[in-house]
């Protein structure tokens, strides 16, 4: 069943006296429970595509449906409600609040959603335990490894039970062992029914996923539907991990 449908999407940015087509006639369907990636070099349009899919922006033309709702011309308030109820985000830089502990970082989206304190606490604890960080619930981000911070970010992304999670270069700041742990966690989430879309420029990550959408010059270049290897090690080149990071993914 289609969760996301894009039909002839165009996104034009006006820069001075020029019109720049970031997306040029993109059509795409993503089904519920899919685990896929959007891959492409800088300037390919992949980030713009993620912004539209994540209801952070609207297209210049074309139609975009999320869970059957047309958001092509949605207002900022309508987009915000869609993000809060159906979409989760995981970022390369984690985007955690450094002065809040794990529990309160994960609770934050529910504060904006108006969820009661009791329900917030119950859902946050469940999400934290789902990513195996129950023993770190009262630590702040500065007391965690990079891999642990990313798992906190994932818990925060799933705490409102979204239909779809977008992950922007989620292993970009992690060593390969920790990156493998994060990729496995995403796969488990997809198997539970949550659609996972990873945005990356890394072919090694893309080759691990069941489907890849390759962007080039604002268009979809290749859609690979065939299953890829799910057992080969995740070979990624990342910065040297911080002390303790590899031992505590």
Write out the residue ranges for each language-model feature.
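H-loop (His-switch) and adjacent beta-strand-loop-beta switch element
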Residues: 212-225
